């Protein structure tokens, strides 16, 4: 098999693959056997028709067509491995030459255009030192958490005064467009200042007492008339204020497992400290990834970026085509960062010879299934059938590479070494003997999992 590579862009290549007849013959033979199982030829049992008869009766074109369909993806995969090209999208195939008969010496020739991960020269990480912030818990952090807990035990009490920010008003709403009522709601409980309903509602309610009403102009945010201006009439039925419990030992015993307020505060401070350490670990991760990219110009694949931006916009606006310039710019910035981070972590996994085992993939997918309350086995089989196992393997490889890389780095805060072992864990002592690169391990794992699934079905 002869392979030539033409660089179209820094992240896009065109492979031209020429296949010798002896390399194509096994695919032709397999195609003949498969066709023989499907056709009836007088004088022969089904599935036992000689290849030459298949060529004569069915036609070599049908045989070659099926053979090419099977051969091209496999030979493309081999070409990628041989040329060490890491694809980031599905290829565009163009079959140019195909033998027209069993005796035709024409070589199968096809091209594959695909976006690829660029070559990334990562720095040596052994002995690397990265400075991060020191975790800090302030008194106001504890007070803020305590106040949040206090609000959970608050009660609403009716008040005979105008509504103010923080109060809860029971209201009736009527929206009109050109004098016609288009929407109405009764008995809605609304917190003034929350700005969770119509624009202008907070201002309209401020200062109103129970039994009073007013009108204001607002834009409807849902329903058939979404986005249209409407005249909204609001009536206040009642006003309630939140009454909070006193901060004392009695509150502590009611709101927690502790008997005193001091004990409760100490526990809150401990939880705040743990959260601060978690934020420090996140900062360390981000700083490490940024350090790997320091001084590097990493191009991103245009097509992959465009698809990801489109998906990002779907989560930002109901109609991506009507997205604002600011939304598009934000989506592009987010996608470019995510892509560069992913490509760098993939390169790191290869550099560190990361090993991805079947149990790694199982544990990763099972944890996702658990988060969504799904049966792990059903979820894993769905991933396999949808062709998403490769992405899962890549994600596992990135995660393992990231942890291994961070373990090799010294993180410091105010000149002192930071111990992140609680978040990074320890390196696995017993790894599988065969090194499997994260980007190419999916096929082997998928075959093994699928084989088990087939065996179960056969029982």
Swiss-Prot record:
The keyword Nucleus does not apply. Its EC number is 5.2.1.8. Keywords: Cell cycle, Cell division, Chaperone, Cytoplasm, Isomerase, Rotamase. GO terms for biological process: 'de novo' cotranslational protein folding; cell division; chaperone-mediated protein folding; protein transport; protein unfolding. InterPro entries: PPIase_dom_sf (IPR046357), PPIase_FKBP_dom (IPR001179), Trig_fac (IPR005215), Trigger_fac_C (IPR008880), Trigger_fac_C_sf (IPR037041), Trigger_fac_ribosome-bd_bac (IPR008881), Trigger_fac_ribosome-bd_sf (IPR036611), Trigger_fact/SurA_dom_sf (IPR027304). GO terms for molecular function: peptidyl-prolyl cis-trans isomerase activity; protein folding chaperone; ribosome binding. SUPFAM superfamilies: FKBP-like (SSF54534), Triger factor/SurA peptide-binding domain-like (SSF109998), Trigger factor ribosome-binding domain (SSF102735). One of its GO terms (cellular component) is cytoplasm. HAMAP family: Trigger_factor_Tig (MF_00303). Consists of 3 domains; the N-terminus binds the ribosome, the middle domain has PPIase activity, while the C-terminus has intrinsic chaperone activity on its own. Belongs to the FKBP-type PPIase family. Tig subfamily. NCBIfam families: tig (TIGR00115). This is Trigger factor. It comes from Bifidobacterium longum (strain DJO10A). The lineage of its organism: Bacteria, Bacillati, Actinomycetota, Actinomycetes, Bifidobacteriales. The gene is tig.
